[in-house]
């Protein structure tokens, strides 16, 4: 007679399907189609296969239906039957490289897409990426989601039990599970591997054996010999003798759960396909173990029952972001990998979120249409650039190219719609106060606050006017300050839908302009004036320029305005003085270079490291664009650094050093100070020819503080200035690398 079951294990079949990680998009798409075809067949034909979690996303359904559009009804049937859990995400982003608005749009798009098929997974499933943002509980609760599964990662010091109340800065709470050992893969590694493969994943015996493990092929072209092997037969093995120990071990690896007799076991892994033997494995587990009932279920089923078994008042509370490390789980190294992707993404976000969409929305309230379909396509390109592997570039070069392509499409769509909105605005303007031949400038302020600043603009005047210098005036004639930079000749096409492009010959004047106040989210119209003319054919007596003698550039190495003073040092660093307080910050903007034998995800210094400072090299320093509104100092430093690192077959095991061969790394910085600004603008570019290293910008503050602050997602993240140490007084230096958005401060 079988003993009555006193414990329950909810086993969730799932996969983690990276859209493009190990393989580029179309190789991955082929594998996805094979996977989805098989999954649908199992769900439709095996009544004991009660459900499958499709990784918390919906873009994989979108991708699949591009190839198999005829299967949309089949997918919808499984979603509506509760057997296929999809969403709430559209794509699976890494959080810290992308804007908070993008996370909200991602969730909204995923939920809408899922609802079209029958409904979305009501659990915040987020086991991907490298760290969780502090405001997730508020974001999820605003969407009606009260439970979460989160990994990568909260420490056991903060959450000694798997379950905790995750609390955001506004006080919103989610009942959350961090899962146990091997997190989302515990059932796959501890149950699937022994029973299906007669193997243990974390054992040294896990290796492919030619002629024994299965049949695999590999392309032998020498140029792609590094490509993976692919198995072409299906695994039919089943080792029932391993069931009891494997099932018990899987159960035991969730021993940190708050409810000892009710546990969540996740049976899936990266790119894992549905296991058709899973119902049999669970039936055999029930037969082999007397007191535990193993049954397939869903995250929703697990949390519904968990809620009944706990007292929320006794559940530990965890505040804020979840990125406690170890470094391989939450290192910021991925944030610094292929930085050009992040830069282009920031530009795309600015165009879509802060400029194009707000103006189009505002104009639509005045009776104009809103280009919804265009914006939907722009957001699709942007969100498809945000999967955690794609946005960080921890992929092959082909995928990097694809990600950049998507970002560029989003930018082009956003810029096009912005120009269309400006054209619509111009048609609506009352310009009766100006003469028909006046040249006008429309100054648009997309920010949610009034601005008055110095900007750099290019203003064209007809060549037949022979304008030597321009001015700019308010609508009432009040002049605005202008600083001339340069002038050149162009012939510019004028697009006309009713004619061929018209050639328009112009003088292009590059100037700095003090805008005067522009209202929040608004605009102003100003007039271009012709301050001086010249004889274009004159060769011997050029028109001379006058100066007000109040230039911001004091010398080739010094800038000063009302609030700040900058002095550049011979080594390329600079000293910054706040004139309102007298405080001086010295030796800013040194460059530090050191070896890195880690990988995409974690920084790892070679054992025999060399740290090289730009302060050991001379710099070339010059002044440019000097005038009363703006001035810039250029700094060029050429550092000699090791060409690469030398290490053994396994980078982390003992041997590693930087090479003796040196290469030049040219660093060019441009420091700009504008009239009236209380901040300094610095643009630095690096021509990198070396490998296996990292480059850091050093900004000493001499401020003693316990905390540092950084812009996060709809909050300011406060973190310890020094990373918290463990009981032995140690910490991982890599975890001192912190993410930031628009700013960081101490």
Short names for language-model regions:
Residues 11-13, 50-54, 85-88, 122-124, ...:
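Hydrophobic faces of well-ordered beta-strands that scaffold small-molecule active sites
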Residues 52-63, 89-92, 124-133, 151-158, ...:
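Short, solvent-exposed turn/loop segments enriched in Gly/Ser/Thr/Pro and often Arg
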Residues 137-145, 165-169, 282-290, 311-312, ...:
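Short, surface-exposed basic-aromatic patches at helix termini and helix-loop junctions that form
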Residues 104-142, 233, 249-264:
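CE4/NodB-like, metal-dependent polysaccharide N-deacetylase domain
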Residues 676-718:
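Acidic (Asp/Glu-rich), glycine- and aromatic
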Residues 8-17, 22, 159-432, 444-446, ...:
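Active-site and substrate-binding clefts of carbohydrate-active enzymes
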Residues 1-97, 101-105, 113-115, 142, ...:
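N-terminal catalytic cores of secreted or lumenal carbohydrate-active enzymes
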């Amino acid at each position: 007679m079988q003993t009555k079951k006193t414990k329950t294990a909810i086993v969730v079949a799932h996969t983690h399907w990276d859209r493009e990680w190990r393989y580029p998009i179309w190789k991955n798409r082929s594998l996805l189609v094979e996977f989805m075809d098989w999954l649908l067949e199992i769900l439709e034909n095996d009544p004991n296969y009660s459900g499958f979690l499709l990784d918390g996303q919906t873009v994989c359904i979108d991708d699949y239906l591009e190839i198999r559009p005829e299967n949309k009804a089949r997918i919808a049937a499984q979603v509506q039957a509760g057997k296929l859990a999809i969403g709430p995400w559209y794509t699976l982003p890494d959080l810290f490289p992308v804007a908070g608005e993008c996370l909200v749009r991602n969730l909204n798009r995923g939920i809408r897409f899922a609802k079209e098929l029958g409904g979305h997974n009501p659990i915040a499933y987020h086991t991907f990426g490298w760290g969780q943002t502090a405001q997730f509980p508020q974001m999820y609760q605003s969407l009606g989601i009260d439970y979460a599964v989160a990994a990568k990662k909260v420490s056991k010091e903060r959450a000694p039990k798997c379950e905790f109340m995750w609390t955001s800065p506004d006080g919103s709470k989610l009942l959350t599970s961090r899962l146990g050992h091997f997190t989302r893969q515990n059932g796959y590694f501890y149950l699937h591997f022994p029973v299906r493969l007669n193997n243990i994943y974390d054992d040294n015996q896990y290796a492919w054996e030619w002629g024994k493990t299965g049949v695999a092929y590999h392309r032998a072209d020498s140029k792609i010999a590094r490509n993976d092997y692919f198995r072409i037969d299906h695994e039919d093995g089943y080792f029932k003798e391993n069931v009891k120990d494997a099932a018990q071990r899987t159960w035991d690896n969730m021993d940190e759960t708050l409810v000892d007799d009710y546990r969540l076991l996740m049976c899936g892994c990266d790119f894992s396909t549905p296991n058709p033997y899973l119902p049999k494995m669970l039936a055999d587990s029930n037969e082999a173990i007397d007191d535990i009932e193993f049954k397939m279920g869903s995250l929703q089923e697990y949390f519904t029952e968990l809620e009944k078994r706990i007292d929320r008042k006794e559940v530990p509370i965890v505040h804020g972001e979840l990125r406690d490390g170890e470094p391989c789980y939450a290192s910021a190294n991925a944030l610094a990998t292929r930085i050009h992707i992040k830069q282009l993404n920031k530009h795309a976000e600015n165009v879509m979120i802060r400029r194009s969409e707000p103006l189009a929305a505002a104009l639509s309230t005045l009776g104009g249409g809103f280009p919804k379909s265009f914006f939907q396509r722009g957001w699709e390109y942007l969100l498809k650039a945000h999967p955690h592997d794609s946005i960080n570039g921890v992929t092959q070069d082909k995928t990097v190219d694809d990600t950049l392509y998507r970002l560029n499409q989003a930018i082009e769509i956003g810029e096009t719609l912005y120009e269309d909105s400006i054209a619509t605005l111009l048609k609506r303007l009352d310009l009766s106060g100006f003469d028909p031949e006046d040249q006008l400038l429309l100054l648009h302020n997309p920010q949610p606050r009034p601005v008055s600043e110095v900007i750099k603009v290019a203003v064209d005047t007809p060549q037949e006017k022979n304008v030597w210098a321009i001015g700019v005036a308010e609508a009432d004639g009040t002049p605005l300050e202008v600083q001339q930079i340069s002038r050149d000749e162009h012939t510019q096409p004028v697009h006309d839908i009713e004619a061929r492009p018209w050639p328009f010959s112009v003088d292009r004047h590059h100037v700095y302009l003090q805008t005067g106040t522009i209202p929040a989210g608004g605009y102003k119209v100003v007039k271009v004036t012709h301050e001086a003319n010249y004889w274009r054919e004159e060769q011997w007596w050029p028109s001379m320029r006058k100066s007000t003698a109040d230039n911001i550039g004091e010398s080739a190495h010094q800038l000063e305005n009302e609030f700040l003073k900058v002095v550049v040092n011979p080594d390329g660093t600079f000293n910054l003085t706040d004139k309102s307080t007298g405080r001086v910050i010295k030796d800013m903007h040194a460059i530090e270079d050191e070896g890195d034998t880690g990988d995409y995800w974690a920084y790892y210094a070679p054992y025999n490291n060399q740290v090289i400072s730009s302060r050991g090299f001379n710099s070339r320093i010059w002044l440019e664009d000097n005038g009363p509104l703006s001035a810039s100092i250029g700094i060029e430093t050429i550092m000699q650094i090791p060409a690469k690192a030398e290490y053994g077959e396994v980078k982390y095991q003992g041997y590693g050093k930087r090479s003796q061969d040196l290469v030049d790394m040219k660093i060019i910085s441009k420091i700009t100070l504008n009239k009236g600004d209380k901040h300094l603008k610095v643009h630095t570019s690096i021509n990198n020819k070396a490998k296996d290293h990292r480059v850091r910008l050093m900004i000493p503050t001499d401020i003693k503080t316990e905390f540092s602050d950084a812009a996060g997602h709809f909050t300011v993240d406060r973190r310890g200035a020094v990373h918290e140490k463990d009981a032995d007084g140690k910490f991982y230096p890599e975890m001192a690398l912190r993410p930031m958005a628009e700013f960081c401060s101490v």
